[in-house]
């Protein structure tokens, strides 16, 4: 219960504080934010939690074939700061394909984390045409895919 109270206080404080734009942060601050985000994902994995919204960045370690069963999804693996590998399933029926994504690319992202034993899945990396779910995105080489 104490942890829940502290987490609620943290969220309230974060919501009330003035957010700095990424451009205004110095390198040490950017590194601390990146580590903090990766730690959140590592914690979600350790606790086997799902359906939690995350923002982070990482390096593409493998590009997979598209999933074409049902809604089409572009798939690739990304390693985040804690060396955790995430499977991205980016809906290309609702959003543009991430163009020319390749091994070694650095991406930033916002999406929903789903636990799986291999590290986790990130989905909802696109807009929601019905507006019933938070919209996500993937940023590669300065271009945002949503």
Predicted regions and their residues:
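Nuclease-adjacent, charged terminal/linker segments that flank catalytic cores
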Residues: 1-4, 19
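Sec-dependent N-terminal signal peptides
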Residues: 4-13
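OB-fold and OB-like single-stranded nucleic-acid-recognition modules
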Residues: 16-146
């Amino acid at each position: 219960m104490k942890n829940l109270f502290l987490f609620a206080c943290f969220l309230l404080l974060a919501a009330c504080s003035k957010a700095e734009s990424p451009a205004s942060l110095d390198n040490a601050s950017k590194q601390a934010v990146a580590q903090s985000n990766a730690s959140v994902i590592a914690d979600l994995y350790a606790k086997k939690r799902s359906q939690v919204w995350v923002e982070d960045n990482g390096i593409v370690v493998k590009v997979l074939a598209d999933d074409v069963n049902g809604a089409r999804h572009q798939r690739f693996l990304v390693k985040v700061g804690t060396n955790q590998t995430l499977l991205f399933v980016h809906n290309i029926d609702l959003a543009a394909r991430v163009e020319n994504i390749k091994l070694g690319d650095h991406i930033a992202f916002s999406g929903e984390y789903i636990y799986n034993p291999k590290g986790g899945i990130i989905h909802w990396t696109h807009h929601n045409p019905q507006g019933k779910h938070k919209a996500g995105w993937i940023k590669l080489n300065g271009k945002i895919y949503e």
